[in-house]
């Protein structure tokens, strides 16, 4: 028992370094996914059926196939076509593309939940569709989308562990490397799991805090 505890203490710098990288990878993937997801959401709401169809196909493919398969196709598959990526860019692209598919549906639903009368009211005072979207619709849609997007981010933090399969040095990969040297399988994966749990708990608490702040603003606009 003491040896296991000492191993965790000795390995802590490597695990924490991996945890920091996990958060960086998650933030980068979430940000890029939100940008692409917003574009896809607008495409899904387009009156042009080819544009809408393309967005639907993208979302269907990336939501309907395993993330690990997507990572493998990007990292191991693209070199067959002369496109070679280092592990970190490959993971970032894969996580971003996958996140975008889920974010698109969340954002589309949030925008669609806003009363359509607000579009008409904005048009009546001379606002363009983009001005209406930016000034009236998006601020309200953001409040609706915050809880599911926060949950998606927490899931993304855990999903980054799949990047270990393409040699990305995030938390789970660090645990794998230490395990291969020490053969302490249970100890190291338990330590890594606890770090994931702490990160998820902290992020969940932050989510609840921001949701409560938004709810207070709705009840008391002043």
What are these regions (language model features)?
Residues 1-222:
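Transmembrane alpha-helices and adjacent helix-loop boundaries
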């Amino acid at each position: 028992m003491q040896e296991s505890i000492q191993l965790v203490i000795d390995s802590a710098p490597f695990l924490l370094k991996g945890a920091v990288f996990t958060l960086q990878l998650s933030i980068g993937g979430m940000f890029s996914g939100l940008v692409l997801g917003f574009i896809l959401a607008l495409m899904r709401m387009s009156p042009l059926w080819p544009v809408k169809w393309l967005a639907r196909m993208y979302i269907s493919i990336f939501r309907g196939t395993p993330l690990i398969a997507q990572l493998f196709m990007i990292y191991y598959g693209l070199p067959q076509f002369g496109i070679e990526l280092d592990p970190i860019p490959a993971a970032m692209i894969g996580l971003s593309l996958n996140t975008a598919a889920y974010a698109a549906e969340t954002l589309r639903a949030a925008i669609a939940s806003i009363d359509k009368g607000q579009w008409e009211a904005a048009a009546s005072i001379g606002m363009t569709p983009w001005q209406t979207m930016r000034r009236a619709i998006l601020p309200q849609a953001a409040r609706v989308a915050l809880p599911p997007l926060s949950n998606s981010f927490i899931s993304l933090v855990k999903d980054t562990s799949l990047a270990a399969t393409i040699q990305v040095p995030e938390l789970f990969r660090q645990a794998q490397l230490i395990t291969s040297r020490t053969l302490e399988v249970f100890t190291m994966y338990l330590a890594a799991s606890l770090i994931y749990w702490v990160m998820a708990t902290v992020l969940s608490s932050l989510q609840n805090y921001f949701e409560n702040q938004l709810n207070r603003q709705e009840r008391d606009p002043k």
